[in-house]
Structure formats: C-alpha cells, structure tokens
From Swiss-Prot:
NCBIfam families: PRK05610.1, uS17_bact
GO biological process, one term: translation
SUPFAM superfamilies listed in its UniProt record: Nucleic acid-binding proteins (SSF50249)
Keyword Cell membrane attached: no
InterPro entries attached to this UniProt entry: NA-bd_OB-fold, Ribosomal_uS17, Ribosomal_uS17_bact/chlr, Ribosomal_uS17_CS
Self-association state and partner proteins as the record states: Part of the 30S ribosomal subunit.
Protein name: Small ribosomal subunit protein uS17
Keywords on record: Ribonucleoprotein, Ribosomal protein, RNA-binding, rRNA-binding
Protein family: Belongs to the universal ribosomal protein uS17 family.
Classification via PANTHER family: 40S RIBOSOMAL PROTEIN S11 FAMILY MEMBER, SMALL RIBOSOMAL SUBUNIT PROTEIN US17M
Length: 85
C-alpha cells in the first residue's frame, strides 16, 4: 500500500464501537496556557473507519487522516496498538 504524501496520524483510545464499520476514537493532547504557563489536557473525538469491526472499547489505536468517507468520517484505523481484552 503506497501512501500519497504525509498524512496526519493520531494515537487515541476507542470510546465507542456500536456503529457498523465505525469507531469513535478519543485523542488527548497537552496545550500550554498562554498566561499561566500551565499545561492543560484537551481532547477531541474522531469517528474512524474500521473495516473489520476489530477495534473494541478501551483499545489504543493509531488513526490516519483520509478522504471524507461520510458526513463525519475523515479518519481510518491503521493499527490496534494495545488491546483491552
């Protein structure tokens, strides 16, 4: 499989797998507050395409940016790093 260009990748945790071929992945990041110089945890949820329905709740996964697959899906699950079960 050849990649076209450098695509964004994120590491996150699956928080929902109830949809068919879709998983919701929560990605955490640290942001430095501009005034207080304290690091604050920020999170975002992404709907990611999971062709084989392999990802389960609690799994750590790598997601990669892709073309729009539906109204909300712009990410695919590339690899399951760590399985919860």
């Amino acid at each position: 499989m050849s990649e076209r260009g450098n695509r964004k990748t994120q590491v996150g945790v699956v928080v929902s797998d109830k949809m068919d071929k879709t998983a919701v992945v929560k990605v955490d990041r640290l942001v430095k507050h501009p005034v207080y110089n304290k690091y604050i945890k920020r999170s975002a949820k992404y709907k990611a395409h999971d062709m084989d329905n392999a990802a389960k709740i609690g799994d750590r996964v790598i997601i990669v940016e892709t073309r729009p697959l539906s109204k909300d899906k712009r990410w695919k699950i590339r690899q399951i790093i760590e399985s919860k079960a």
